[in-house]
Amino acid sequence: MKHGSVPATPEAASLVFGDRLEAAELYARILAGAGVEWGLLGPREVDRVWERHILNSAALGELMEPGERVADIGSGAGLPGIPLALARPDIHVTLIEPLLRRSEFLRETVTELGLDVTVVRGRAEDREVRDRVGEMDVVTSRAVASLDKLTRWSVPFLRDGGRMLPIKGERAEVEIEEHRRVMESLGAVDARVVRCGANYLSPPVTVVDARRRAAKPGRNKSGRTARSRGRTGRR
């Protein structure tokens, strides 16, 4: 894939990516080259590709546990999923992207970086995609949609107690209050704002952290009881 020129690697990158720093630097060049050429990154973003995009995404790794299965919905150029996979090789990342051209970019990028990352083309809200991806511990996203829509797309992927961790902006706390009722009706509870990367990013990354409520005994994930599924009605 086409590589572009990027600013000098910030010192924080070596701390975040460790022995995968060279792969992170390669990803930065891919974003600056093919990413711009394919329309996935604006040309003006190249100068801040590290702080605004790569380190910003990788900071999310502070919230992950070893071995967790993480889905990045609406992955686009691979943000936040690819930096997250580079920073945290002990988790498994799946990138979900509905557009063909973008999913091709993701597959080529993952191959060039040598990452064990799964790319699934499809819409997060489609049942077929959920069946292919399977149950996740975490669902994340970045600049994809409003919090109510993200909840509707994210919760069906999550195991009971799993977390949705979308990267949000300065209005995150306001957005939680605006959509809390809808989120809770969809099964996302205990929503709060957390911040990551404070040691090397200014401002730090703002993330909404919400947990999938455990299903009540006797209910499946759609909310229907086993008894109601088997009921045939009176004759």
Swiss-Prot record:
GO CC terms of this entry: cytosol
Which residues are listed for S-adenosyl-L-methionine binding in this entry?
G74, L79, A124, E125, R142
The EC designation for this entry is 2.1.1.-
Enzyme class per UniProt: transferase
Q: Which UniProt keywords apply?
A: Cytoplasm, Methyltransferase, rRNA processing, S-adenosyl-L-methionine, Transferase
Q: Please classify the protein's predominant subcellular localization into one broad category.
A: cytoplasm
Output the InterPro entries linked to this UniProt entry: rRNA_ssu_MeTfrase_G, SAM-dependent_MTases_sf
Q: Where is this region: Disordered?
A: 211-235
Citing just one GO molecular function, the answer is:
rRNA (guanine-N7-)-methyltransferase activity
Cell compartments where the protein resides: Cytoplasm
Pfam families recorded: GidB (PF02527)
Q: Where is the composition biased (Basic residues)?
A: 213-235
PANTHER family (UniProt xref): S-ADENOSYL-L-METHIONINE-DEPENDENT METHYLTRANSFERASES SUPERFAMILY PROTEIN
Relate the protein's function as given in its record: Specifically methylates the N7 position of guanine in position 518 of 16S rRNA.
Say which family it is in: Belongs to the methyltransferase superfamily. RNA methyltransferase RsmG family.
Name the chain's protein: Ribosomal RNA small subunit methyltransferase G
User: Where does this protein come from, organism-wise?
Assistant: Mycolicibacterium smegmatis (strain ATCC 700084 / mc(2)155)
